[in-house]
Structure formats: structure tokens, C-alpha cells
Amino acid sequence: MSENTAERTTRRKVREGLVVSDKMNKTITVMVEDRVKHPLYGKVMTKSVRLKAHDENNEAGMGDRVRIMETRPLSATKRWRLVEIIEKAK
């Protein structure tokens, strides 16, 4: 293997969101909100998406603010993993 193929410098997406479900074993559902401007009318809208993330130690709970990172497919719907818990729920 050459040095170029040994070192991959792929940029992985990192998102912050709120944990909306932690009922599954080693999996959390994270609601990620993004503010986008409408292309024609210019109104700023909030778009949200629910992503499933891998939580190896079941650390995150409902209402926690977390940072997740894109990874290889771990299951049929899981392509993200928990990086850190930014703020625990009160």
C-alpha cells in the first residue's frame, strides 16, 4: 500500500442536537435543527431531521444536548455515533 491510500483524509460531518429518544439499547435518536433560507422567498425556516446515533455505553439520556459524527453504516438506519455530551438534561 502506498502512503496515499494508507492515510485517508475524509471530512466527517459533525452535528449538534437534542436527544429525543434513548429507549433502544446502545442507540439514541437525535433531533438536529438547521436554519435554511427559502431560495425564492427568502424566509428563514427551521428544518429538523431525526438521526439515529450509536451510544456504546448508554451514556446519553432524554433531553441531553449531544455532538454526533458521521461514520460507516452500523445498521439499517444508523450512520452516526456519539462523540460527546455537551449538556446533560436538568
UniProtKB/Swiss-Prot annotation:
CDD domains: Ribosomal_uS17. Disulfide bonds: none annotated. Gene3D superfamilies: Nucleic acid-binding proteins. PROSITE patterns: RIBOSOMAL_S17. Pfam families: Ribosomal_S17. Keywords: Ribonucleoprotein, Ribosomal protein, RNA-binding, rRNA-binding. GO terms for molecular function: rRNA binding; structural constituent of ribosome. GO terms for cellular component: cytosolic small ribosomal subunit. GO terms for biological process: translation. Part of the 30S ribosomal subunit. One of the primary rRNA binding proteins, it binds specifically to the 5'-end of 16S ribosomal RNA. Belongs to the universal ribosomal protein uS17 family. This is Small ribosomal subunit protein uS17. It comes from Cutibacterium acnes (strain DSM 16379 / KPA171202). The lineage of its organism: Bacteria, Bacillati, Actinomycetota, Actinomycetes, Propionibacteriales. The gene is rpsQ.
